[in-house]
């Protein structure tokens, strides 16, 4: 991943846009259903992002993606501190999304159902061996799955559902506390 120069507002410098093949036009972005992704949580693997870690607990590293004509831009926001890296599409070996099943209670029938594909882990592997990892919240999973199934990633994208036992959803405890007298 290459560190990318951005303005304070997060706009890419023209030289960086040119390096990654340029931005898509308005109509191209409309046809693609957008070029940006929803935010996910950065875990590890990118030196420029790891260097921003102040050691302050509970600070979340949110990352969003933007497709360029010949690259993928990753923008990190950590408590109003911004960083940006990019990688050319040709340098990406694979993009792997693993889904994890969650057991959630069905309020209507008062039983538990297994919901599939609710939480995920995303890994981007480059040909040079570098791997970066991200965690996907349940509310962003479907949109990220749709984002990486675009034709720009068709030969790089791998999707699987974990064979691990379904995880338990503890949201029912919050619901119970809300109904507590």
Model-derived segments and spans:
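Acidic, Ser/Thr- and proline-rich intrinsically disordered linker/docking segments
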Residues: 1-43, 56, 93-181
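Short Pro/Gly-enriched beta-strand edge/turn motifs at strand-loop
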Residues: 43-49
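Phosphoinositide-binding peripheral membrane targeting modules
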Residues: 56-108
